[in-house]
């Protein structure tokens, strides 16, 4: 068995710290988790933490970026698998996939709070995963309804949709305000439809 390269070892330590922080934040909450908790669970020295992250807020930001990106890519992949040819139904399916994911993963939604965010997804994807963001934007621009827009405007629309969905999911699923997500879906979908027309 080949030895892991130094780069692979560093990536593994960073992943171990992220996984440890994820579990600590879920179990104890962000406020009650200490850096000592994170490094103890990851079985690394405290100094190792600071090689990768500035502080607890920095590791949380990395977690939110990672989680948000995975959710968006998952929703995009599931939408692609449905082979929906009409624009609006495809966008609504994409949104519904995100909503249903959050409904099934309330603890995760509590963890990332209102930070499910398109800019964070873009930040993650720009770190070497640009293919996914380009595929999503190309797909969005391929619909006749979007051909009138340039890539920047399409990006802004996608940004607004993801921000809106993230905020509404947190308020309605976690806080049950102003109503349950199932009650709000029709209104949310009408808002998205207006944004896309």
Regions found by a protein language model. Give the residues of each.
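Secondary-structure edge/capping motif, primarily at the C-terminal ends of alpha-helices
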Residues: 75-83, 109-116, 169-176
């Amino acid at each position: 068995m080949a030895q892991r390269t130094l780069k692979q070892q560093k990536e593994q330590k960073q992943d171990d710290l992220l996984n440890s922080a994820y579990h600590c934040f879920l179990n104890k909450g962000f406020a009650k988790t200490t850096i000592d908790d994170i490094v103890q669970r990851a079985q690394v020295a405290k100094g190792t933490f600071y090689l990768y992250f500035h502080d607890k807020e920095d590791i949380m930001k990395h977690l939110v970026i990672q989680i948000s990106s995975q959710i968006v890519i998952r929703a995009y992949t599931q939408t692609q698998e449905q082979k929906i040819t009409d624009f609006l139904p495809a966008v609504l399916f994409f949104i519904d996939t995100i909503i249903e994911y959050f409904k099934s993963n309330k603890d995760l939604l509590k963890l990332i709070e209102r930070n499910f965010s398109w800019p964070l997804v873009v930040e993650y994807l720009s770190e070497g995963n640009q293919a996914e963001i380009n595929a999503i934007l190309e797909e969005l621009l391929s619909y006749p309804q979007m051909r009138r827009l340039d890539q920047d405007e399409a990006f802004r629309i996608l940004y607004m949709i993801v921000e809106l969905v993230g905020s509404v999911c947190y308020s309605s699923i976690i806080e049950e305000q102003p109503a349950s997500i199932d009650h709000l879906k029709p209104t949310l979908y009408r808002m998205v439809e207006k944004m896309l027309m």
